[in-house]
């Protein structure tokens, strides 16, 4: 899932500090990672600048002038 200020981003945020496609979150069904997409201003996770890093529930992602909290919400699949 890509995040940025461009309409082509999966999640579009009106923040001039964000690149058109700033970062993406990758989820494999068990584990998640955040990857900076060569943004101009960089992406930080829990206060550390990253290129790519594994993330867990309640991880703070900062990009541009925006803060994001990654949440994992379990859901029950009924049969």
Region spans (language model):
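Regulatory inter-domain linker segments that are low-complexity and enriched
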Residues: 65-79
């Amino acid at each position: 899932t890509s995040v940025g200020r461009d309409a082509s981003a999966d999640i579009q945020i009106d923040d001039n500090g964000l690149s058109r496609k700033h970062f993406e979150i990758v989820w494999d069904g068990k584990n998640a990672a955040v990857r900076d997409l060569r943004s101009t201003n960089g992406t930080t996770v829990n206060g550390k600048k990253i290129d790519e890093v594994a993330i867990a529930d309640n991880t703070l992602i900062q990009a541009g002038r925006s803060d994001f909290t990654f949440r994992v919400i379990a859901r029950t699949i009924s049969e």
